[in-house]
Amino acid sequence: MGAPEIELDLWPDKDGHLIVCHDPKVDRTTDGSGMICDLTTSEIKALDAGFWFSPAYQGIRLPLFEEVLSLVARRTVLNIHIKTPVAQRVTTDKMKARGKELGERHISHAVIMPPLPVGVEDVIPEIENRPIVPYDETVFRRIVDALQRFDCMDYAYITGEADVLTTARAVAPDLPRCCLEGHMNFSIVEHALEYGCQRVQFCKGLTTQAMIDKARANGLICNLFWADTPEEARAYFDIGIDCVLTNNYQPVAAGLSR
C-alpha cells in the first residue's frame, strides 16, 4: 500500500511475549476471551483473529511483535503504541462521559470535527494529579531489544502515556517519543514538553487550534488520531497536522493525491 507509517499496539502476555492487538482483551477480535496479560503465548496463538472480519481471513492469528518486525522492519516507520495495563489506569465519571461522547459522536457517526474553539479546555485535575507508576522496564527492554535485532531503531518511535514516557526516557532516551499523556484532558502539549517528546498525538474532538499551534511552535511533529475520509484528513492537514492515523488508508491516500 505504500503507507509511510504503521501504528500498532503492544501488550505483554502471561509469558512476557509482546502481542500486537488493539484491545487489552481478546474478546472483541478473536474467538476467545480474557485479558492478554492473563493468557500464555500458546493460548493466544490458538485463537482465530480473522473469522469475524471475513471468511477469507479465517485462521489468522494475533501476531507477536517480532513477527510484525520480520515483515516490515526498515520498510516503513513504526508508531509503536505501548498500552498501559488497565489496572494502572485512573479514570473519573467526567472522563468516562468524555470518552462516551467521543465514541458516540466520532466513531459511530464519523463526524468531521474541526478543532474546538479556545476556552473549552476542561482539564480534569484528578487525572493530572494521579500517581504515575513507570512502565515495566523489563518489558520495555524487550521492545528495544527487538527493534535492535531487526535493525530498525531509526524506523520507529514510541507512543504512550506518562508511565511509558517515563520508562522510555530512562531506558532508551535516543528512541523518539510521541506523547499521549493528556490526549483526552487538553494537557497533551504541556506533557509532551515535560517528557521531552518529539511528537504529540492529538485525539480528534479533543483538540483546539491553539494546542496545535503551540505544539508546532515548540517543534513538535503533530499526529492526529484519526480520519477515515480524504476530506477529513485534508481538513486536518490544512490546520497544521503532520500525520493522520487512519483505518482506511488506500481510499484516503488516493483521495488526497487527487
Language model: regions and residue ranges:
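Metal-dependent phosphodiesterase/phospholipase catalytic core, i.e.
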Residues: 4, 22-176, 198, 218
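Active-site beta-loop-alpha junctions enriched in small/polar residues
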Residues: 11-15, 23-24, 83-85, 160-163, ...
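A glycine-centered beta-loop-beta connector
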Residues: 13-18, 236
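The start of beta-strands in P-loop NTPase/AAA+ ATPase cores
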Residues: 2-4, 17-18, 76, 242
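Catalytic domains of carbohydrate-active enzymes, especially glycoside hydrolases
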Residues: 1-12, 192-200
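Short glycine-/acidic-enriched loop or helix-start segments at secondary-structure transitions
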Residues: 17, 30, 90, 168, ...
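C-terminal active-site rim and adjoining tail of enzyme catalytic domains
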Residues: 176-258
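Conserved beta-strand positions
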Residues: 8, 80-82, 202, 246
